[in-house]
């Protein structure tokens, strides 16, 4: 077996990050071109990443750096983006955001799981795909996977399904935005309540401007926060299904807690107090968008269509139909709840 020198691994790691940075910068230039500007830098970064991944390709040695961008830099960007928000505005949206997000999360969990089982998808893959659709995409899938004892291959398929669906609907939302009967605020609620990943919600909501983006993040982070109670319920359910002689005590310490939400709230508090000069805040927000664009590039590079060939399209169609039902419910609830 060939020995890999630590310096080579480090170089490959930073090369992977460098690829996402290059894509983010190119997307930043392209988004200033007429007709492409409606997509925005974040959506363009996803598209370029997908094109790069399926033409030039991505070396396995570079994947660790790309994963770092798509996960760690995403969270760093979200935290810094908290500087855009005022806590009083979040408080005003709080109850409505919670109810809207909670209702749609329940719809998505029940619908996607039921459809997947109807299409004869195994229980583990059905649970993971339902959680990915309902809560926060790949992050929810990876968090729930140990609770349901999912194999790596099963987790990978679920992540691939959500990545493809989320990216597809992000592009559709962006293209359809001018034709939707929503105010910018309503569009932000809709995007935050129905799209899969945090990255997808942020990318799609940029089409509606700052107001749409702000409320989209609030609604989406409300869904992310609900990962903890969902994980508790799934953990208890799985423990009850274990054979009596194999049962271990369920521990709250093993629960996946999205700590970055507290960083986001802390940055919002800093902005509310007015602790930082406006010039510094603007600089940090620009940095947030660069980090988010790099995360989008990583998301696009990680979309793997090959997984469907091995496991079939049943889970994809369950996710697709479930997402369409989620979108329909999200659309209707905007008016039923009188949001915006």
Curated annotation (Swiss-Prot):
Its main location: membrane. The keyword Membrane applies. GO terms for cellular component: plasma membrane. It is a multi-pass membrane protein. The chain crosses the membrane at residues 12-31, 36-58, 94-116, 126-148, 155-177, 215-237, 257-276, 281-303, 315-337. It comes from the Bacteria. Keywords: Cell membrane, Membrane, Transmembrane, Transmembrane helix. Pfam families: Cons_hypoth698 (PF03601). InterPro entries: UPF0324_pro. It is found in: Cell membrane. Belongs to the UPF0324 family. This is UPF0324 membrane protein OB3406.
């Amino acid at each position: 077996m060939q020995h890999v020198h630590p310096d080579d691994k480090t170089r490959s790691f930073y090369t992977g990050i460098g690829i996402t940075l290059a894509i983010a910068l190119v997307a930043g230039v392209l988004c200033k071109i007429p007709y492409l500007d409606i997509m925005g830098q974040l959506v363009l970064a996803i598209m370029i990443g997908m094109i790069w991944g399926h033409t030039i390709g991505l070396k396995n040695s570079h994947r660790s750096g790309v994963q770092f961008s798509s996960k760690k830099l995403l969270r760093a960007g979200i935290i810094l983006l908290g500087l855009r928000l005022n806590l009083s505005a979040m408080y005003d949206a709080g109850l409505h955001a919670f109810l809207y997000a909670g209702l749609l999360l329940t719809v998505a969990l029940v619908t996607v799981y039921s459809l997947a089982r109807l299409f004869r998808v195994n229980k583990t893959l059905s649970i993971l795909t339902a959680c990915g659709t309902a809560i926060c995409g790949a992050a929810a899938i990876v968090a729930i996977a140990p609770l349901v004892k999912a194999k790596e291959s099963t987790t990978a398929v679920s992540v691939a399904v959500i990545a493809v669906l989320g990216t597809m609907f992000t592009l559709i939302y962006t293209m359809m935005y001018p034709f939707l009967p929503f105010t910018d605020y309503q569009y932000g609620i809709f995007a935050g309540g129905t799209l899969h990943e945090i990255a997808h919600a942020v990318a799609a909501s940029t089409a509606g401007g700052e107001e749409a983006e702000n409320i989209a993040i609030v609604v989406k982070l409300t869904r992310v926060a609900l990962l903890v109670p969902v994980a508790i319920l799934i953990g208890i359910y799985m423990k009850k299904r274990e054979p009596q002689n194999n049962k271990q005590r369920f521990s709250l310490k093993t629960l996946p807690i999205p700590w970055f939400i507290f960083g986001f709230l802390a940055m919002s508090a800093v902005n509310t107090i007015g602790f930082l000069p406006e010039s510094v805040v603007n600089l940090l927000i620009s940095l947030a968008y660069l980090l988010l664009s790099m995360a989008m590039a990583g998301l696009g590079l990680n979309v793997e269509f090959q997984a469907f060939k091995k496991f079939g399209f049943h889970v994809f169609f369950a996710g697709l139909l479930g997402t369409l039902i989620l979108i329909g419910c999200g659309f209707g609830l905007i008016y039923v709840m009188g949001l915006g």
